[in-house]
């Protein structure tokens, strides 16, 4: 509207011209007419039909009758069944007169006053001609009714109404009946669109309602038949069925497949037009799958569905009570199949009361089972100690409580008492695969370091490496089996002693390796300690070369290898080992989940304190890497008293003793106090 005003401040184009004017252009949807095509274009462009309709409806009440008469008379003259050439000529003259009158009225805005005049003129003109008064009345009254029906549609119905108009001209009683309609016609003209819908709806809505009424006839039985059969029994179970059907039915593989077909009947049924055939296609899938199984078990299906559906959530042996009609065997076997995912627990074979206990025990037993696979132990041996208190990791790995679980060492109780306590902790940690792996890493790295330091590193290193692995594995599982298996440890010690006799360099590292093996495994014995004491002098002589050897750096690959870095140097002797192992290697072992390296026998410790004071003077050269590692380990040195002392004795090195003797004693005393 604003754009139109800006372009042309003329009178609005969308207002229809005065009724009598011959219009070249007319709107399809509304009574708007204009001689200028651009006006009609704008009218259509801006959707001004509403405005024109409102204006026309206001004017129709006043002016439209003359306009309609002129228009309709022109149209009737064109029709083949027009009354006669005389009335057509009269209508043309009358229309011209009305056009002139209407133009003047529109310009002067005297439409209301001029309407009766034009109406009277129409009647006089029509009466002057030979038309009979009823025919004239029909001409005057009929067009508005026809126009009322004709104008709103402007499409197909117009021709029909014109045909009706010709037929009505022939019969006077019809004209009189139509003459009663002008009021209706005028009212329908108010909105050019509303007059059409009333007959249109009346014609079409009735069949629509008939169709709709027929549709609910089909839909209602569908909806009514649906819920009782499907939603109560089949619908909900179908969702949960894959676990439940094998329970309820005796291990039928088809049931898990058919659980989805249960849902399939939902989709086709609403599509089926008639309600009566519904139960037949519904029953067809039921008869294939259910008639033999579920229809026999209808009461059981509810329980089988609603109770066991919880089963997948209690996958570990917490078996939901079986359906009342089902034997426990069926349910348990059927529930096994989904739960094979969890091999450790066999929940189906456990009744609900026993499920917690047996599962707990079985899960405890599983780590030893894995240990069996590692060490190829017999099942009975590995499982023997698993649930017992000795293997329970009550104390923290850093500070295991030695007093909680004391296991009597079989052959060596008398040697030292603390070894048993540390053994219990070692058993605890041996249970843990992570700690076991860490111990293996430490021992392996220690052996590698000692071999690297030794001249015979090429072959012996590999052997000792493999031996260290086997020894630690055996030790871990021997601890789980029995409090102490010193048989293999004694063998290792004997091997190491023989090696020390044969190769002095190799013996130093071998003894260090032995002690590394013995300490985490609590195999330190006075006999072995005395043997090492005899060897200490030789080892001291040999150590400077070994400690300074560069390969020590290779051991610093993992956090667990801190002990190895110092342990390669530890081959001084048990005297020196007691000092520095307590400081460094034990710290690394504590970091290894405190695999409870066996405390050196107290007798040896008591024998060595004087020698320990002497040792720092004797031992001088040392690799800087070993010093750094020792300082780090000493700073990290932690709460394990006896295990620390043994580990520290392993980490002894000459130069570090000369430098840090005071610090080492302080660290040594701390673990002793604890």
Curated annotation (Swiss-Prot):
Keywords (A to Z) from UniProt: Activator, Differentiation, Metal-binding, Nucleus, Transcription, Transcription regulation, Zinc, Zinc-finger
GO molecular-function term, one example from the UniProt record: RNA polymerase II cis-regulatory region sequence-specific DNA binding
Main location per the UniProt record: nucleus
Database matches in InterPro entries: ZNF750 (IPR039363), ZNF750_Znf (IPR039064)
GO biological process, alphabetically ordered: cell differentiation; epidermis development; positive regulation of transcription by RNA polymerase II
The UniProt record lists the keyword Heme: no
Residues annotated to bind Zn(2+): 27, 30, 43, 49
Record's GO cellular component terms: nucleus
Domain of life (superkingdom): Eukaryota
Bias (Polar residues) ranges: 401-411, 444-466
Region (Disordered): 105-125, 370-466, 594-674
Subcellular location, record wording: Nucleus
Start-end of CCHC-type zinc fingers: 25-51
PANTHER family registered for this protein in UniProt: PROLINE-RICH PROTEIN 35-RELATED, ZINC FINGER PROTEIN 750
Function (record text): Transcription factor involved in epidermis differentiation.
Protein name listed in UniProt: Zinc finger protein 750
């Amino acid at each position: 509207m604003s754009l139109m005003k800006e372009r042309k401040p003329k009178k609005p184009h969308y207002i229809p011209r005065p009724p009598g004017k011959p219009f070249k252009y007319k709107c399809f949807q509304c009574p708007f007419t204009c001689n200028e095509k651009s006006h009609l274009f704008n009218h259509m462009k801006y959707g001004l039909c509403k405005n024109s309709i409102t204006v026309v409806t206001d004017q129709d009440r006043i002016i439209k009758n003359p306009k309609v008469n002129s228009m309709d008379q022109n149209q009737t003259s064109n029709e083949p069944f027009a009354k006669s050439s005389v009335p057509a000529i009269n209508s043309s003259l009358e229309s011209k007169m009305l056009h002139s009158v209407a133009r003047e009225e529109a310009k002067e805005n005297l439409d209301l006053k001029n309407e009766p005049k034009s109406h009277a003129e129409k009647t006089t003109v029509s009466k002057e001609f030979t038309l009979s008064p009823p025919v004239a009345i029909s001409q005057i009254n009929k067009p508005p009714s026809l126009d009322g029906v004709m104008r709103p549609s402007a499409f197909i119905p117009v021709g029909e109404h014109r045909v009706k108009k010709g037929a009505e001209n022939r019969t006077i009683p019809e004209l009189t009946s139509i003459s009663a309609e002008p009021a209706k016609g005028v009212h329908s003209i108010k909105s050019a669109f509303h007059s059409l819908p009333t007959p249109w709806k009346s014609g079409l809505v009735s069949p629509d309602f008939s169709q709709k009424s027929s549709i609910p006839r089909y839909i209602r039985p569908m909806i009514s038949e649906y819920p009782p059969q499907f939603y109560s029994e089949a619908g909900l179970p179908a969702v949960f069925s894959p676990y439940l059907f094998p329970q309820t039915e005796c291990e039928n593989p088809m049931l898990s497949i058919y659980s989805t077909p249960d849902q399939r009947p939902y989709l086709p049924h609403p599509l089926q037009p008639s309600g009566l055939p519904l139960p037949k296609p519904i029953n067809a899938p039921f008869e294939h799958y259910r008639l033999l199984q579920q229809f026999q078990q209808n009461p059981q299906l509810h329980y089988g569905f609603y109770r066991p559906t919880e089963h997948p959530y209690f996958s570990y042996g917490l078996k939901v009570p079986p359906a009342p009609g089902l034997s426990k065997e069926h349910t348990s076997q059927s529930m096994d199949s989904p739960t094979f995912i969890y091999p450790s627990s066999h929940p189906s074979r456990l009744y609900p009361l026993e499920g917690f206990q047996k599962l707990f025990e079985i899960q405890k037993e599983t780590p030893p089972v894995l240990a069996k696979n590692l060490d190829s132990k017999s099942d009975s041996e590995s499982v023997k100690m698993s649930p017992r208190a000795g293997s329970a990791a009550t104390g923290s790995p850093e500070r295991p409580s030695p007093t909680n679980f004391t296991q009597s060492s079989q052959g060596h109780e008398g040697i030292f008492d603390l070894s048993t306590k540390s053994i219990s902790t070692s058993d605890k940690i041996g249970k843990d695969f992570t700690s076991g792996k860490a111990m293996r890493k430490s021992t392996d790295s220690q052996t590698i370091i000692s071999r690297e330091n030794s001249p015979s590193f090429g072959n012996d290193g590999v052997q000792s490496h493999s031996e260290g692995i086997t020894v630690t594995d055996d030790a871990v599982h021997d601890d789980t089996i029995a409090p102490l298996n010193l048989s293999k440890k004694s063998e290792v010690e004997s091997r190491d002693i023989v090696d020390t006799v044969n190769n002095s360099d190799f013996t130093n590292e071998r003894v260090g390796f032995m002690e590394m093996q013995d300490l985490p495994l609590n195999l330190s014995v006075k006999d072995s300690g005395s043997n090492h004491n005899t060897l200490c002098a030789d080892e001291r002589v040999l150590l400077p070369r070994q400690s300074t050897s560069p390969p020590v750096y290779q051991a610093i690959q993992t956090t667990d290898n801190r002990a190895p870095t110092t342990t390669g140097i530890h081959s001084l002797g048990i005297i020196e080992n007691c000092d520095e192992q307590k400081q460094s290697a034990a710290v690394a072992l504590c970091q290894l989940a405190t695999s409870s390296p066996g405390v050196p026998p107290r007798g040896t410790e008591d024998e060595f304190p004087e020698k320990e004071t002497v040792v720092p003077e004797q031992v001088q050269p040392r690799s800087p890497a070993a010093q750094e590692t020792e300082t780090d380990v000493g700073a990290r040195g932690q709460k394990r008293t006896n295990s620390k002392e043994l580990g520290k004795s392993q980490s002894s090195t000459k130069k570090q003793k000369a430098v840090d003797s005071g610090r080492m004693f302080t660290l040594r005393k701390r673990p002793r106090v604890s």
